[in-house]
Design a protein with these regions (language model features):
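N-terminal mature ectodomain segment of secretory-pathway/periplasmic proteins
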Residues: 5-107
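A short, amphipathic edge element
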Residues: 8-11, 52-54, 137-150
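Preference for bulky hydrophobic residues occupying beta-strand positions
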Residues: 30-32, 74, 147, 165, ...
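A generic structural signal for short beta-strands and their flanking turns/coil linkers
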Residues: 70-72, 143, 178-180
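Gly/Pro-enriched, hydrophobic low-complexity segments
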Residues: 100-104, 110-116, 121-138, 152, ...
Length: 187
């Protein structure tokens, strides 16, 4: 009997996450450090110097019936050898509509469309050569997942819900993930 209640509560929490007001636009500068990990003394540590990329991004929301669509662009600023590589993404509010993504390759002066996987296969590729996939960059739709509240916990002295998100059978065919665990700040 408690299981459906937890599922309903988890879905309501995720709806609040998606509905939060994050403004009609955003400008940011981000540093992304990635490395190959190895296990050492029961801990994961970088096996080499991290690869560091700095990029700037701009996002703008556009009102549509029932919500908003978003357009964003990201440009690599560092390292110098990759400066000017860009990523453009359109996210759509409409359920079932995939994001559109393009990559600008500065050295070639060319734009390449990043093709979504077909309806029966996930999208492949990594974002700016990191562990982050193009799927991770797309907007999430509430109905593409089922949710389960696993527990409440504390992270850095802040209360959190720990929620498992499992893709629906239809969405699972297009996803690289069988489930994800999300820590949601309760405030």
């Amino acid at each position: 009997l408690a299981q459906p209640l937890y599922a309903e509560e988890a879905r309501a929490i995720m709806q609040r996450v998606l509905d939060r007001d994050n403004g009609a636009s955003e400008v940011s500068r981000t540093k992304l450090a990635t490395c190959r990990y190895v296990k050492k003394s029961q801990r994961l540590v970088c096996a080499e110097d991290p690869r560091v990329k700095v990029f700037e991004s701009v996002r703008k929301d556009f009102p549509v019936a029932g919500g908003k669509d978003s357009k964003s662009v990201m440009l690599i600023r560092e390292p110098a050898g990759e400066q000017g590589i860009g990523f453009l993404q359109y996210d759509y509010e409409a359920q079932g509509r995939d994001s559109d993504q393009w990559m600008y390759l500065a050295a070639l002066g060319k734009v390449k469309r990043i093709v979504s996987g077909s309806d029966d296969e996930p999208q492949t590729g990594s974002f700016f050569g990191s562990e982050i996939g193009y799927e991770d960059m797309e907007a999430r739709h509430l109905d593409d997942y089922t949710y389960k509240l696993l527990k409440t916990d504390t992270y850095r002295k802040r209360p959190c819900w720990v929620i498992a998100a499992k893709p629906t059978p239809e969405h699972a065919r297009k996803s690289n993930y069988s489930r994800s665990i999300q820590w949601i700040d309760q405030e």
